[in-house]
C-alpha cells in the first residue's frame, strides 16, 4: 500500500514599508558649548542601497579653541533634528567633539553628561536612549535601525 504525502508550500509576502525617520539630539548639559556636534544619516531601501543622506551640525568653535567662557550667543540647551526621505532603514553616526577641554583635571569634576538621542519613524518612537558623553573624549555613536515591524507581519498564501 502506498501513501501519498502532500506537502503544502507557503509563501510569506511582506509589503515593503517605507518611513520618514526623524533623528533628534538634545542635551541640557550647561557646558555643552565646549562641544561641537555633527550628525549624519543614510537611509536605505530593502536591498541595502542608500536612497538618501541627511546631515546636521552645531559647531560652536574650532577644535582646540580653549575657550575660557561660553560664547555670548545662547547655546543652551542645544538640539539638532534631521529627517530622511522615505526609506526602509537608517544608519546614523553622531559625533560629539570637544572644542575646549574641561578646566578641571579631576575626574570627579568631569563626570559624563547625557545626550538624548531619539528616533521616530512616521511619528512612532523606535529609539529613545540617553547616551553618556565623556567630557574629555566626547562620543561617537552609531545607530542602525530597521523599519518598525508592520502591524500585520504579512499574509500567508498557499501555492
Language-model-detected regions and their locations in the chain:
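Short, surface-exposed binding/anchoring microloops in extracellular/periplasmic proteins
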Residues: 17-54
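Surface-exposed loop/edge segments in extracytoplasmic proteins
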Residues: 45-54, 64-69, 123-130
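Mature extracytoplasmic domains of secretory-pathway proteins
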Residues: 55-107
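Short coil-to-beta strand junction motifs in C2/discoidin
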Residues: 107-115
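Beta-strand signatures of extracellular beta-sandwich domains
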Residues: 36, 116-120
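C-terminal partner/receptor-binding element of secreted or periplasmic proteins
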Residues: 128-159
Amino acid at each position: 500500500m502506498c501513501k501519498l504525502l502532500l506537502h503544502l508550500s507557503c509563501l510569506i509576502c511582506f509589503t515593503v514599508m517605507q518611513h520618514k525617520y526623524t533623528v533628534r539630539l538634545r542635551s541640557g548639559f550647561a557646558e555643552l558649548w565646549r562641544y561641537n556636534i555633527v550628525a549624519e544619516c543614510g537611509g536605505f531601501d530593502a536591498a541595502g542601497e542608500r536612497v538618501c543622506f541627511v546631515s546636521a551640525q552645531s559647531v560652536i568653535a574650532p577644535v582646540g579653541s580653549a575657550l575660557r567662557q561660553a560664547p555670548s550667543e545662547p547655546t543652551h540647551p542645544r538640539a539638532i533634528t534631521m529627517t530622511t526621505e522615505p526609506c526602509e532603514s537608517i544608519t546614523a553616526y553622531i559625533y560629539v567633539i570637544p572644542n575646549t577641554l574641561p578646566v578641571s583635571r579631576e575626574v570627579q569634576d568631569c563626570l559624563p553628561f547625557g545626550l538624548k538621542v531619539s528616533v521616530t519613524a512616521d511619528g512612532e518612537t523606535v529609539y529613545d536612549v540617553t547616551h553618556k558623553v565623556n567630557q574629555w573624549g566626547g562620543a561617537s555613536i552609531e545607530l542602525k535601525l530597521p523599519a518598525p515591524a508592520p502591524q500585520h507581519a504579512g499574509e500567508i498564501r498557499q501555492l
